[in-house]
């Protein structure tokens, strides 16, 4: 869907995130979206298990769909570094049987970086359900939400000069709130002042 001032909401793209190329589908559509400086729409696609690029003229291509020859789980959210690299989370939510799905090829849930040329790097595999992702204004810290009811946290990772991540730390935890209120850590954004706006139980 899209929203335009004076016009409101209208259909933008259908299908979105699932072309039927992969025979399954739980939460099959696109999830995280971002618009890059060139006006291209990048999408984390649960259904087709990839990061895609939609060009202003309507053309579309895959930026990343595997790591070392194994299909990604179901990319969930993404953010752009000023270098042009895309950082994204890859939980199992798009797979019908989640972590136990027979189509799952990776034995972990990762946070990845993909360069404009399509080179994919695993940044961390320590998170069980990585979800929302965003940089601090100076790009020295990467924040990642974890939507695991048994460990509902936000992590903060230092970003090294080469774009990889240092040892992360737990920024906040709301596990005690899970079950008492609806919701989990999910999407997040960081404003220009460095404030983190995040979904949570509530």
Question: What are these model-derived regions, one by one?
Answer:
Residues 1-202:
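Sequence-structural signature of mature extracellular/luminal beta-sheet repeat domains
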């Amino acid at each position: 869907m899209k929203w335009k001032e004076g016009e409101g909401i209208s259909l933008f793209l259908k299908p979105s995130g699932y072309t039927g190329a992969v025979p399954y589908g739980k939460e099959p559509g696109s999830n995280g979206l971002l618009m890059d400086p060139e006006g291209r729409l990048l999408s984390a696609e649960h259904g087709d298990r990839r990061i895609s690029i939609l060009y202003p003229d309507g053309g579309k291509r895959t930026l990343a769909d595997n790591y070392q020859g194994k299909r990604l789980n179901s990319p969930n959210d993404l953010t752009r570094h000023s270098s042009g690299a895309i950082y994204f989370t890859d939980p199992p939510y798009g797979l019908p049987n989640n972590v136990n799905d027979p189509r799952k090829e990776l034995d972990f849930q990762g946070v990845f970086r993909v360069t404009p040329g399509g080179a994919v790097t695993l940044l961390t595999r320590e998170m069980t359900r990585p979800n929302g992702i965003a940089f601090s204004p100076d790009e020295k810290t990467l924040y990642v939400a974890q939507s695991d009811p048994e460990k509902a946290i936000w992590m903060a990772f230092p970003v090294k000069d080469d774009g990889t991540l240092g040892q992360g730390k737990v920024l906040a935890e709301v596990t005690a709130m899970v079950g008492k209120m609806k919701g989990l850590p999910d999407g997040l954004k960081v404003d220009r002042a460095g404030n983190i706006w995040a979904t949570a139980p509530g």
